[in-house]
């Protein structure tokens, strides 16, 4: 089921999410299915449970190709529950980000270029992966949602933050959301 996506300004997006306590429950399974339905319908690269009003540490991400980020490499489809992130170096890179909860805007955000993320899949099996580049950026962006952080809070240079249609006029109109 496609759920409504909360938008910046909704105070629920600023809450810290709670860890998932039980895996393989009908409720968790339904939540994850709804998250994928919602992300796919919105053509997103990822989605965090708080974006649909659920205060649980659940994020999903991944795509083969994403028309909102046409130059981005594929990212493996992942369900990540109760995640932790460990940067593998101090190296950071600026990159453009958008968000389904901040429609029509893009901004440049510094992110760690290489990291290790751990957590669990929907069955409670451990996940332990190394990510770099856009994959690492997506993981950090989605996990920020679990701490009540939206990407504009990380923008450092507001001359590089604005409406997608102005910043990227070459993108078709449907890329602006």
From Swiss-Prot:
Gene Ontology MF terms: metal ion binding; peptide deformylase activity
Stated role: Removes the formyl group from the N-terminal Met of newly synthesized proteins. Requires at least a dipeptide for an efficient rate of reaction. N-terminal L-methionine is a prerequisite for activity but the enzyme has broad specificity at other positions.
Gene: def2
Cofactor binding annotation: Binds 1 Fe(2+) ion.
Pfam families given in the database record: Pep_deformylase
Entry keyword Protein biosynthesis: yes
UniProt EC number: 3.5.1.88
Keywords: Hydrolase, Iron, Metal-binding, Protein biosynthesis
Name the record gives this protein: Peptide deformylase 2
Catalytic activity, reaction form: N-terminal N-formyl-L-methionyl-[peptide] + H2O = N-terminal L-methionyl-[peptide] + formate
Binding sites annotated in the UniProt record for Fe cation: 99, 141, 145
Reported cofactor(s): Fe(2+)
Residues annotated as the enzyme's active site: 142
């Amino acid at each position: 089921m496609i759920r409504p996506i909360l938008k910046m300004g909704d105070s629920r997006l600023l809450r810290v999410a709670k860890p998932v306590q039980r895996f393989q429950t009908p409720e968790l399974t339904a939540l994850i299915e709804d998250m994928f339905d919602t992300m796919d319908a919105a053509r997103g690269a990822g989605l965090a449970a708080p974006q649909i009003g659920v205060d649980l540490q659940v994020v999903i991400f991944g795509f083969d190709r994403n028309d909102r980020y046409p130059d981005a490499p594929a990212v493996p489809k992942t369900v990540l529950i109760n995640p932790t992130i460990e940067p593998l170096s101090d190296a950071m890179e600026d990159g453009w980000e958008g968000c389904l909860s901040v429609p029509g805007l893009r901004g440049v955000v510094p992110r760690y270029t290489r990291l290790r993320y751990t957590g669990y899949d929907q069955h409670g099996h451990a996940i332990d992966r190394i990510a770099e580049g856009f994959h690492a950026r997506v993981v950090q962006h989605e996990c920020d949602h679990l701490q009540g952080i939206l990407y504009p809070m990380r923008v450092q240079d507001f001359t590089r933050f604005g409406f997608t249609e102005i910043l990227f006029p070459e993108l078709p109109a449907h890329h602006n959301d």
